[in-house]
Structures are given as C-alpha cells and as structure tokens.
UniProtKB/Swiss-Prot annotation:
This is UPF0251 protein PH0803. SUPFAM superfamilies: Sigma3 and sigma4 domains of RNA polymerase sigma factors. It comes from the Archaea. Belongs to the UPF0251 family.
Length: 110
C-alpha cells in the first residue's frame, strides 16, 4: 500500500481551477414557504463553476474540464448535481448557499 493511502482514506481529490468565484453566495426566497423550514441546499464552487462554464458561457463539457483541470466525466457529475440543486431551490423555495470545499484554486479574473 503506497504511503498516505491508509484504510478508509480513498483517493485524493484533484485541485479545481475556479476562474470566477460567485459574487453572490447566498440565495433565499423573498417570501418564506409555508410549513417548517427546510435545510438550505449547499452547492460547491466546483458545481457552480461547471454550471457557469457550460450553461452560461456555452462551453462544451470537455472545454470546461480543461479550464477547471478535471475530466469531462467529473464536469458532467458536477453539472448534473448543480442543475438538480438549482431546480430543487426553485421548486421547493429553499435557500441555496455556495461554499468552497477547500480543493479549489481561485483565480479571480475580473
């Protein structure tokens, strides 16, 4: 077993390149929903960046992967998760908070 790969550790996550961190990181409904409050939805910078590059900038998943330093498959998973979270936020009227995971390299190019 290679050094640093102890039991239960799994594979180390690659660093992700984030070119434009979100300017607004917390979204919430203007009118609270009826009933008990639901927990907020958490979106990662990786999911946000994949959504921004593919749906907003119009890049292919392969191009987005190159920009982020990850595989096209990882972009696909992040994009699918981000789209589901945005839909869930809109349909259920829940808060959405965008947070870093700690494995991002933020390169703000404003």
């Amino acid at each position: 077993m290679p050094f640093g790969w102890g039991r239960g550790r799994g594979r180390r996550r690659k660093m992700r390149m984030i070119r434009f961190p979100p300017q607004v990181r917390h979204f919430y409904p203007a009118i609270p929903s009826v009933g008990p409050p639901k927990p907020p939805i958490i979106m990662t910078y990786e999911e946000f960046e994949a959504l921004r590059l593919v749906d907003y900038e119009g890049l292919t998943q392969e191009e987005a992967g190159r920009r982020m330093g990850i595989s096209r498959g990882t972009v696909w998973r992040a994009l699918t998760s981000a789209r589901k979270k945005v839909a869930q936020m809109l349909v259920e009227g829940r808060e959405l908070i965008i947070l870093p995971q700690g494995n991002e390299i933020v390169r703000d190019e404003k």
